[in-house]
Amino acid sequence: MAVTIKDVAAAAGVSPSTVSRTCKDSPSISRDTKERVRRIMAQLGYEPNFEVEPVEAFSKTIGIILPSSQRDVYENAFHLEIIRGIGQFCNQRRYVNTVITGQDDAEVLDAIQSMVANAQADGFILLYSKKDCPVAAYLRNEGLLHVIVGKAAQSANQTIYIDNDNALAGEEAADYLYEMGHRRIAYFGVSNAMLFSAERKRGYQMSLLKHGITPREEDCVEIDTLNDAYEETLKALLTAPDRPTAMLVSDDILAVVLEQFCDKLGLHVPKDLSIVSFNNSLFSRITSPQLTTMDVNPYQLGMEAASQTINHIENPNLLATKIIVPHRLIPRESCCPPPEV
């Protein structure tokens, strides 16, 4: 019986589509994976069939992977700016890009696997990084070329990623509040499973320790989605006798939610509570008062992600690069010294 592509895939521990793309010397497959697959092909005596080949377009395609919308609390203009940066760079280099999303990780993964099986993408850009991510694990285990926007949660040395120094940004944001006179500074963010939020929280804690303040977990409110029952926890924190006079918030959209919640409680921003947020998205400018926010330059994150993806498609033997994009604080109207200062 003739050896099939499925036999090779099973022996090599990869998918049939990976074997197919190895036969075509696709740059989206890592050198190590290609060598392993070719070794198994030789051992089994597999002969690829090139009689039916898809017509390749001159343009190559990059898949842009968004977070699953069911779990995401920070999907907003931030991602649109990243995609705008990716699109701008891809247009300059005559690459096509396509957006991949779904209601949960399984749906996103299914869409990616379908693209891979049909050889519809030469590389992927993952717009988020979280712990125990099945999408990142699939891309890594299949040896597929991918770039992560955010710090890699696993195999960081072998992963191409573009990020900000989120710990430093969190520290500088908390420093700003401390220098304004605040000593009771709280934190409101998304789950620590999202690495950007975990790093910003770590920076916030580093700032407090640097200034001789012991961080308290009861001063940190973290949620997975806006549907979480967080309001009672937030209310208890903001109405306590020793309530915080300032709060660091991991994202602009959560900061808008916080402003609205303060209004319900009869608290005024910034007189009763100063707020520093992140991303400098449209939300930070259309709310009242406008948010003091850390600009993490999402457009440049997108440009760099596209640049590295294309660079590695065209030069598959390059080592995994890591690029840190700078940040800067944008002071606006949501901060002032605490009442006692």
Where are these regions (language model features)?
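Hinge/beta->alpha junction and helix N-cap segments in small-molecule ligand-binding domains
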Residues: 68-81, 99-107, 162-172, 188-233, ...
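N-terminal helix-turn-helix/winged-helix DNA-binding helices
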Residues: 3, 42-77
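Extreme N-terminal segment that seeds HTH/winged-HTH DNA-binding domains in transcriptional regulators
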Residues: 1-12, 16
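Flexible loop/hinge segments that line or gate small-molecule binding clefts
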Residues: 127-169, 214, 253, 279-291
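Flexible loop/turn connectors
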Residues: 231-341
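Short acidic capping loops at alpha-helix termini that bridge into adjacent secondary structure
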Residues: 183-184, 215-219, 269-274
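Central regulatory/effector-binding core of bacterial HTH transcription factors
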Residues: 83, 87-126, 130
